[in-house]
């Protein structure tokens, strides 16, 4: 349809005798440029969609890695807590054996200390249960992500009994079933909203993880305090046991307890190091989050630009449809006019046949009258006949001219309507291009002003740096000479007064403090220092 629009006016103009080839060439160029721009916009949209898909996949992979690391860290903490609990139980058993050896002297004190140790053990076990509960809450909150967050964590806990034992902890750890599930990317039109929701949920999960890490640090600090208290109590208990008869056995138990306490301290230090590593990983996740936010901002800008381009495309499609409808209407009008011309041709054929009949009859009548009338009348009739033929020829010529003018007018009407439609399209394109060029020109002017301002500032800074460097070089070069001249100033002035007859010697003096200087460079440096 577009090729018909572009070629049809050209043919009509050639029929009418007018040559509008440059105008048609410009229209062809503009249409080709518009088609190229539309293709470029479609390619850019496809590229943006591919980049969005790649970004989504990268985010999914990074989230899966972070969740795996977090779960591994939780499992390590649980195992460390179990080891600590076992060591505390072994310490308790050793203390109980040592208490049985010294039960003869201090049964009441040992019973009270045993009760305290039992209470502390129950507290530690309760704290361990709280830690396991926190871990389960963490995994529940991580599992509460929807399909848009690309990760789903499900787990089932088996807990029974009042105090958490090793077997129950192992069951809980074995029953944590982590399943990762990636979400399918939505269609091209509506891919921005789930990504924003996923990013916001990721930010929330990162905040919750940082808060939980802080809680774990506090709990580790409290556990360290309790371990210190246990160490103090064991040391006190050892001091009391020294007074008993079994000094050798108690000394051995003290050595064992101190070694075990050192081992516990080392394990606590390792746990602190692991916490620091988790904090570093969280910082890396925050940096990755910031980079993702920047990328999302860039993608939003690109989407806005694509929306503007899509609106322009829709307007172009609307104009193309409008032109197609106009072409169809003009084709229907052309068909009607062709039918009219065929009917007129049929009428002309009928008139021509009748004219031929009349002419033949006229010739026969003329021959008969010639035979009848005289020569004078014959001549008069011939003259009249010539006049009538001339009049008929004139009328026929005028009729032909009127027909040609009518056909030309009809063709001119068609060309005028097509040209008007093209002029409307070209005007719309011209206004759009002019507005775009004005915007580009304004942006160029703003960038040029900024560039000139930055160049001026750069030149100023460069001049200042060059001046400072030259002054520093001069100061380094003539620093020693200025000090010597300051000490020998009066002597040089007196000598200059004595030798006024020597015109070749030039004396450089400061106008403020009357200090004589051997060089102009040192004088400039001294004047700058003296004025400041």
From Swiss-Prot:
Keywords: Coiled coil, Cytoplasm, Cytoplasmic vesicle, Endosome, Golgi apparatus, Metal-binding, Zinc, Zinc-finger
Chief place where the protein resides: cytoplasm
Name assigned to this protein: Optineurin
Keyword Aminoacyl-tRNA synthetase on entry: no
GO MF annotation: an example: zinc ion binding
GO terms under biological process: Golgi ribbon formation; protein localization to Golgi apparatus; regulation of canonical NF-kappaB signal transduction
PANTHER family named in the record: NF-KAPPA-B ESSENTIAL MODULATOR (PTHR31553), OPTINEURIN (PTHR31553:SF2)
Residues that span the membrane, as ranges: none
Native source organism of the sequence: Xenopus laevis (African clawed frog)
């Amino acid at each position: 349809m577009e090729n018909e629009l572009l070629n049809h006016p050209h043919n009509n103009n050639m029929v009418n005798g007018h040559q509008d080839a440059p105008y048609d060439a410009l229209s062809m160029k503009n249409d080709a440029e518009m088609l190229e721009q539309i293709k470029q916009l479609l390619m850019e949209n496809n590229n943006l969609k591919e980049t969005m898909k790649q970004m989504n996949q990268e985010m999914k992979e990074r989230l899966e890695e972070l969740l795996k690391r977090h779960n591994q860290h939780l499992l390590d903490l649980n195992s460390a807590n179990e080891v600590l609990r076992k060591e505390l139980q072994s310490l308790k058993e050793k203390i109980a054996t040592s208490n049985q050896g010294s039960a003869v002297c201090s049964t009441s004190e040992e019973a009270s200390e045993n009760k305290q140790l039992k209470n502390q053990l129950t507290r530690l076990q309760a704290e361990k249960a709280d830690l396991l509960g926190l871990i389960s809450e963490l995994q529940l909150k991580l599992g509460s992500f929807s399909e848009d967050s690309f990760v789903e964590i499900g787990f089932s806990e088996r807990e029974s009994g009042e105090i958490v034992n090793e077997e129950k902890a192992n069951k809980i750890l074995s029953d944590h079933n982590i399943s990762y599930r990636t979400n399918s990317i939505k269609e091209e039109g509506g891919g921005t909203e789930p990504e924003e929701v996923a990013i916001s949920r990721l930010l929330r999960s990162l905040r919750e993880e940082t808060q939980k890490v802080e809680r774990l640090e506090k709990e580790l600090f409290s556990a360290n305090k309790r371990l210190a208290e246990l160490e103090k109590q064991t040391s006190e208990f050892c001091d009391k046991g020294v007074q008993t008869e079994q000094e050798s056995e108690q000394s051995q138990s003290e050595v064992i307890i101190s070694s075990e306490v050192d081992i516990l301290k080392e394990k606590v230090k390792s746990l602190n190091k692991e916490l620091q590593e988790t904090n570093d990983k969280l910082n890396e996740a925050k940096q990755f989050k910031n980079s993702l936010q920047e990328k999302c901002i860039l993608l939003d800008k690109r989407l806005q630009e694509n929306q503007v381009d899509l609106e322009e495309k829709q307007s172009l499609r609307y104009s193309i449809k409008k032109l197609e409808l106009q072409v169809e209407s003009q084709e229907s009008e052309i068909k009607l006019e062709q039918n009219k011309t065929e009917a007129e041709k049929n009428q002309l054929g009928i008139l021509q046949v009748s004219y031929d009949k009349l002419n033949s009859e006229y010739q026969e009548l003329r021959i008969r009258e010639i035979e009848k009338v005289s020569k004078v009348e014959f001549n008069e009739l011939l003259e009249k006949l010539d006049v009538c033929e001339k009049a008929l020829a004139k009328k026929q010529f005028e009729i032909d001219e009127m027909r040609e003018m009518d056909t030309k007018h009809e063709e001119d009407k068609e060309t005028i309507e097509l040209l008007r439609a093209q002029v409307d399209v070209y005007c719309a394109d011209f206004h759009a291009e002019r507005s775009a060029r004005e915007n580009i020109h304004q942006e160029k002017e703003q960038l040029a002003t900024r560039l000139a301002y930055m160049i001026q500032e750069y030149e100023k800074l460069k001049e200042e740096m060059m001046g400072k460097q030259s002054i520093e070089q001069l100061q380094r070069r003539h620093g020693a000479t200025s000090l010597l001249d300051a000490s020998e100033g009066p002597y040089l002035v007196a000598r200059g007064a004595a030798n006024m007859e020597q015109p070749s010697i030039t004396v450089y003096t400061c106008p403020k403090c009357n200090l004589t200087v051997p060089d102009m460079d040192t004088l400039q440096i001294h004047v700058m220092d003296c004025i400041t």
